[in-house]
Amino acid sequence: MKKIILISGILLLAINLVMILMISCHSGDLSGQPGNQSIAADNYLKYCAGCHGSKLEKFAEKAWMDEEGTSSAFSSIKFGIETIGMPAFQKTFSDPEIEALAAYVKKGIPEDRSLLKPAVTPGGVVESEVQKFVVDTVVSGLNVPWGLAFLPNGDMLISERSGSLLIFSKGKLSPPVEGLPPMMAVGQGGLLDICLHPDYDKNGWIYFSYSALNTQSKKPIGNTAIMRARLKGNALYDQQVIYKGTPETDRNYHFGCKIAFDGEGHIFFGNGDRGQHFDFPQKLDNSNGKIHRLNDDGTIPADNPFIRTPGAIGSIYSYGHRNPQGTCIHPVTGDLWISEHGPRGGDELNIIKPGLNYGWPVISYGINYDGTILTNEIEKEGMEQPVFYWIPSIGPCGMTFVTGDRYKNWKYNLLLGSLPLKHLERVVIKNNSVLHREELLGGIGRVRNVVMGPDGYIYLSIETPGKILKLMPVL
């Protein structure tokens, strides 16, 4: 009797093992079947394209793209990577759906990855709704250019997020400028914006935003910082760190940080929430999730809104922000405008007023990346509404108001870059309301910065492929 039971048990175990192997093999095949790939494509566009690009271009440099199989991609999708802001999707997708999504991503990258990097047709005339122009490539071969500023002699300062500062002069790039501080150059961190003091001709100050690395810590931690320095030859000197955000964290995203001067001796910039939205943006005892205002020497203005609030950081000008990526002053009203990234949907365009609460994360028009509800509130007493919000997200970045007479049909329009959707966006504004939007240069690359040059032309910095473009109007 015992032998019969034992034999039966062995047979049952063998049958189960065969069934498990069949199911396992079948599940592996499912990921590549047309129906499942179609579902994976839909899931990618719905959940992933906003950050990684609709054509999968952000995956081209991932190390796991060259690995056999999909185990690394599967793990990243299922469990996420908190330090870089990659959410976990284990509650959103089943394992077969994750496997299909991982297979879709790997299958979608062409062998020639340069095909993922769109180029502008040289000399081709771009016809927008009200303005014709030609796109001229001024500088190429850059590594994720971020900031862009012009010296009085016409030389161009370019920051690369990897931590290099370059000078473009007479058609050539300099070696990296010496004298920069230690940086947390990982993820979204590194060397960020560059801005010349309005009286640069007299004082020579150049301002830099960057993710400062704590060199005393055993693990890499840091936060947004602002340094000013002077330039001589190919080196910086008189370096002064005038701001360093607190607390420091090991997360390498949501640093902000564009710089703007108001013409009255004040510098404005945004410090992102550092990926901890429930901890920082609504509290005044930390720097994160805030717009800051300083005097140009780093001291705190006497009329800052929270300077007399017990426990508050004195440089805070407004709070309740997620990740401000664009900062500029309106050329007529003098108002401070910012663009900031929402989560999935809910990117915002805001006019910043002192002491106001802009709501994040209590109110938002977006949801979590994995599709779950972030908040049920889109408005609340005591919290500001955006001038405009984008659904779906465009990932708005550096921006500027068009000035001068070279682009008469765009005058005082707002131009801002889109990172994930890879276009330049023109926004028509009247009485602080958005009347119209136009997408320009679709597929040009991740538009990181938009700058009005001293020559009156519009310049764009493109992350991938790394280059600086100039828009030449055609009459």
Language model features with spans:
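N-terminal export/targeting leaders of redox proteins
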Residues: M1-S38, P96, L116, G124, ...
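Sequence/structural segment immediately N-terminal to covalent heme-attachment motifs in c-type
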Residues: P34-S54, S71-F79, V139
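Short pre-active-site segment immediately N-terminal to redox-active cysteine/selenocysteine motifs
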Residues: Y44-G50, K55, G85, E97, ...
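Extracytoplasmic electron-transfer domains, predominantly the class I c-type cytochrome c fold
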Residues: G50, E57-E111, G190-L191
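Acidic, Gly/Ser/Thr-rich repeat motifs that build Ca2+-stabilized beta-propeller blades
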Residues: I98-A100, V105-H277, G326-I329, D335-G342, ...
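Blade/loop signatures of beta-propeller domains
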Residues: R113-V134, L236, T299-T309, Y365-K380
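Beta-propeller blade signature
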Residues: T224-G233, L284-D296, I352
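Conserved blade-ending motifs and adjacent loop-strand segments that build the rim/top face
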Residues: V434-P454
